[in-house]
Structure formats: structure tokens, C-alpha cells
């Protein structure tokens, strides 16, 4: 396979959104791309997921001060979270109770674990340097690739051997700032607008217009996580957040009502996965992780 090893002004891609859309590339009008592909050959959709998810985790880290991770599929997040310690129940339903977890690994365990069916084959974004614990967690899941500001040597070695050596590993310059004006072409017509630079943090929550002024810090944190997640979710979009992680995301629905139902149903499933009957299901030995996820979803839905 062809691998990109260094930063460049442009990268030629195999094809665009669909195999018939050729030629395809990503490029900069000025300067070099702020990325280095350390392994694999990411495609058009991979890069869309990578760049959108990176912005999400970067903003989560800036807003909360905690390591953040996102699980992206088809240019919307399936999960997003910060590195808050997991209790034993969540470790079990996320299938990470056999692994040592760093704060960054915990963030990805939460992001991946919230909606495991949607996260199957995801693209991962990490706010901090990918460590060995996070790489080991990524290595056991079906995934297309990862973007992070850096990788420890141990983590990079693990990821380079994933998917028979073709796993996509992207390093991004965390100091990169895009131009304040962005462009998009549709049907040969160019749209121009200022970037969405709104800063979503607790400074937005200083004025509480209700009789009760009680607003717990945990609730503020979760509200900010929801807002940042929705900033990078295709509209219409709805997000339920609890304890530092999205537990149900509805994306790209024409109806806000249907979108709310979709996100709410995912949140319901997240809660029901913690029921003792689900946690104690008798699994056959060596069942595939995807088969286990699908079975749990069907069992709960019935």
C-alpha cells in the first residue's frame, strides 16, 4: 500500500465520497497541510471525519480542561466524552473492565461505549497524545483510523500493526488555526462565510434567568459538552449527556421530533444496558464483539 509519511501542500486521494468521484485530493491554497499521515492511506470521508472530530475534542479539552475523545461516523459524532473515571458497571458494559485505563483511554471508552452499534468502524479523535493504554483499547475495536496531536512510540507501534498494517493514523499540529473565512462549492457555485468561532464554555452560563439559582458544576459541564458536540453534528441534531459523555445523539434528521426520539431511544438503550439481566447475559465463548453488541441491542429493543 502507499503511505504518506510527511507533511505536504496536498494529498492525492484514491477517490472522493464515492468510487466514481475522481480525481480527489485535499490541499491548502497557502502553506502545508497541518497533518502528517503516520500510517495507512485515509480516504475522503476519513479526512472529513478526522478534521471535524478533531475540532470537537480540541474544544472539549479547552472548555473542560479534561482529556477528550470522539467517535465519528459519516461526518457526525456517534459519541463524545471527557476523561472522567468509570464506575464498575460502566467498565463492564463498555467491555473495558479487563484493561488499565488512563484519563484519555477512559474518554475514548466512554465515547465508543455510548452507542456501540453506531460506533462500529468509527474514526477516532483524541485531544491529547495517544498513550499505550488508549492504543490498546483502540486496537481491540473495529475502527477506520485515529487523529491526535501526537503518539507515544509504544502507542504508534500498536496502531501501525492494526488491520494488517493499513490502519489510518493521522498526526495533527495542535497549534494550527484555519483562516477566518471558509468556502464551499455546490453545483459549481462558491459559498463564503465566516467560520463558526463561537466559544462554548461556562462563561455562557453566568446569567441564570430562573427563580432558583442552583446550577451544579456537573450540570454546567454536561451542558457545555452537549453544545460542543452538537456544533459538529449534522442538523437537525439532539444530544443527551450524562456524567461527561454523550449517551444519545440524533443527527441529520429532517424532523426535530424524530431527532429527539432517536437520541432519546439511544439514551434509553444506554441506561438499559446497565440492567442486571443485560449485564449477566450468558455469552458463548469467543463471541465476536460486534455480534455481542447487536444481540444486546435486539434483546433490549424487544
Which role does the model predict for each range below?
Residues 42-43, 212-215, 249-253:
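Short, surface-exposed loop/turn motifs that are enriched in glycine and acidic residues
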Residues 1-204, 219-237:
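Active-site loops and adjacent core secondary-structure elements that bind or stabilize anionic groups
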Residues 78-116, 247-302:
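Glycine- and Gly-Pro-enriched alpha-helical subdomains that act as flexible
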Residues 242:
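A cytosolic small-molecule/anion-sensing beta-strand core signal
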Residues 180-215, 272-301:
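Substrate-contacting helices/loops that form the catalytic groove of nucleic-acid
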Amino acid at each position: 500500500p502507499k503511505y504518506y509519511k510527511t507533511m505536504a501542500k496536498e494529498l492525492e486521494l484514491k477517490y472522493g465520497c464515492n468510487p466514481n468521484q475522481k480525481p480527489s485530493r485535499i490541499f491548502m491554497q497557502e502553506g502545508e497541510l497541518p497533518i502528517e499521515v503516520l500510517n495507512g492511506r485515509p480516504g475522503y470521508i476519513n479526512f472529513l471525519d478526522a478534521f471535524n472530530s478533531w475540532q470537537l475534542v480540541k474544544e472539549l479539552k479547552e472548555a473542560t480542561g479534561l482529556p477528550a475523545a470522539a467517535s465519528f461516523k459519516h461526518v457526525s459524532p456517534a459519541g463524545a466524552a471527557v476523561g472522567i473515571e468509570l464506575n464498575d458497571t460502566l467498565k463492564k458494559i463498555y467491555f473495558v473492565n479487563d484493561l488499565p485505563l488512563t484519563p484519555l483511554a477512559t474518554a475514548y471508552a466512554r465515547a465508543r461505549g455510548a452507542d456501540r452499534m453506531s460506533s462500529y468502524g468509527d474514526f477516532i479523535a483524541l485531544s491529547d497524545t495517544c498513550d499505550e493504554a488508549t492504543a490498546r483499547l483502540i486496537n481491540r475495536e473495529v475502527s477506520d483510523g485515529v487523529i491526535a496531536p501526537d503518539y507515544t512510540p509504544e502507542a504508534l507501534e500498536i496502531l501501525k500493526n492494526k488491520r494488517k498494517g493499513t490502519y489510518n493514523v493521522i498526526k495533527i499540529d495542535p497549534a494550527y488555526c484555519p483562516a477566518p473565512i471558509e468556502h464551499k462549492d455546490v453545483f459549481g457555485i462558491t459559498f463564503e462565510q465566516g467560520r463558526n468561532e463561537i466559544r462554548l464554555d461556562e462563561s455562557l452560563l453566568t446569567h441564570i434567568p430562573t427563580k432558583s439559582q442552583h446550577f451544579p458544576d456537573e450540570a454546567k459541564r454536561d451542558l457545555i459538552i452537549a453544545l460542543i458536540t452538537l456544533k459538529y453534528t449534522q442538523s437537525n441534531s439532539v444530544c443527551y449527556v450524562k456524567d461527561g459523555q454523550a449517551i444519545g445523539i440524533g443527527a441529520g434528521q429532517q424532523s426535530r421530533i424524530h431527532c429527539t426520539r432517536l437520541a432519546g431511544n439511544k439514551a434509553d438503550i444506554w441506561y438499559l444496558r446497565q440492567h442486571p439481566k443485560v449485564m449477566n447475559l450468558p455469552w458463548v465463548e469467543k463471541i465476536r464483539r460486534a455480534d455481542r453488541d447487536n444481540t444486546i441491542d435486539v434483546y433490549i429493543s424487544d
